[in-house]
């Protein structure tokens, strides 16, 4: 299985366009060792030629321009994106669909709950009907495996996770199980598995078996501490309010990852306030000591028989 990180940041990217927090200002003036990042998205493939896009960030045009794998040679217009899977209906995972309108129709897999949000509160399905058939919805049900024709050797399973519905959803603060899913992806040729969860609020007992059997975890690294935005003076929400489990809490993401046997544990969806973006920070060193990696834009991962 081939995996490539298109974007590794949370909503707003890094540096965020209107932010002068210590990280954003430090990156701009060169006083911290860090790299710019676009908003969260990945692609996966079973052959390195045809790809499935997992979430479409607002930065998708820039991401495609920097990803030669997605250029389809030999055709006047085309793409190597053979399907799109959405893990939720959040703006930073769906706005990019609008930028892909010239390539419609697109085959899109998502839960009925996500489809409802994207047909009402943020109606991209409705809007894009005017572009060559728009988005063709393929419903997915939690814990029911499915495949995408472009990559038949990849088996996807949507796993419900605890997080929140977006502000424009009528289910805000009372989400249904299909509003947020992780993806458990198995490469059927060798049995290697990836667990992809860019937004994870509170792991429960039903989620643990999926985490425990994954060879590689690509998982929520949004905030270091729950009150991070408040402490930085840039917002009132906690990580938990936004549906994200803080890394450093007593029962946070680092503690969870320490208990799991995956060969590689990689963080994605990293907020611009998170101190781990500074490669020389104590927090970044703490991750290294636990064998936890921080993804970057353009990071390539290959799952093989012996290691991932």
From Swiss-Prot:
InterPro entries: Metallo-B-lactamas, PQQ_synth_PqqB, RibonucZ/Hydroxyglut_hydro. Pathway: Cofactor biosynthesis; pyrroloquinoline quinone biosynthesis. This is Coenzyme PQQ synthesis protein B. Keywords: PQQ biosynthesis, Transport. The gene is pqqB. May be involved in the transport of PQQ or its precursor to the periplasm. It comes from Klebsiella pneumoniae (strain 342). One of its GO terms (biological process) is pyrroloquinoline quinone biosynthetic process. Belongs to the PqqB family. Pfam families: Lactamase_B_2 (PF12706). Transmembrane segments: none annotated.
């Amino acid at each position: 299985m081939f995996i490539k990180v298109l974007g590794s940041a949370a909503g707003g990217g890094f540096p965020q366009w209107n932010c002068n927090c210590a990280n954003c200002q430090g990156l701009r003036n060169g006083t911290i060792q860090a790299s710019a990042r676009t908003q969260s998205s990945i692609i996966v493939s079973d052959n390195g030629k045809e790809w499935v896009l997992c979430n479409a960030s607002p930065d998708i045009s820039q991401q495609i321009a920097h990803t030669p794998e997605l250029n389809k040679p030999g055709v006047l217009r085309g793409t190597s994106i053979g399907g799109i899977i959405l893990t939720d209906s959040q703006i930073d995972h769906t706005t990019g669909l609008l930028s892909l309108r010239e390539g419609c129709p697109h085959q899109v897999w998502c839960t009925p709950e996500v489809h409802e949000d994207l047909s009402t509160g943020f109606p991209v399905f409705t809007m894009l009907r005017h572009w060559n058939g728009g988005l063709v919805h393929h419903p997915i049900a939690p814990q029911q495996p499915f495949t995408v024709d472009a990559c038949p050797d990849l088996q996807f399973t949507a796993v419900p996770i605890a997080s929140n519905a977006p502000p424009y959803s009528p289910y805000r603060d009372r989400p249904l199980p299909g509003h947020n899913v992780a993806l458990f992806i198995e490469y059927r040729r060798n049995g290697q598995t990836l667990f992809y969860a860019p937004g994870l609020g509170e792991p429960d007992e039903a989620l643990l078996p999926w985490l425990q059997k994954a060879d590689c975890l690509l998982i929520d690294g949004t905030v270091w501490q729950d009150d991070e935005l408040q402490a930085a003076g840039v917002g009132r929400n906690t990580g938990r309010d936004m549906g994200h489990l803080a890394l450093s809490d007593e029962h946070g993401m680092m503690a969870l990852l320490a208990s799991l046997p995956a060969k590689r544990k990689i963080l994605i969806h990293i907020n611009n306030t998170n101190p781990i973006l500074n490669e020389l920070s104590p927090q970044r060193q703490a991750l290294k000591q636990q064998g936890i990696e921080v993804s970057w834009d353009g990071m390539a991962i290959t799952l093989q028989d012996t290691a991932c």
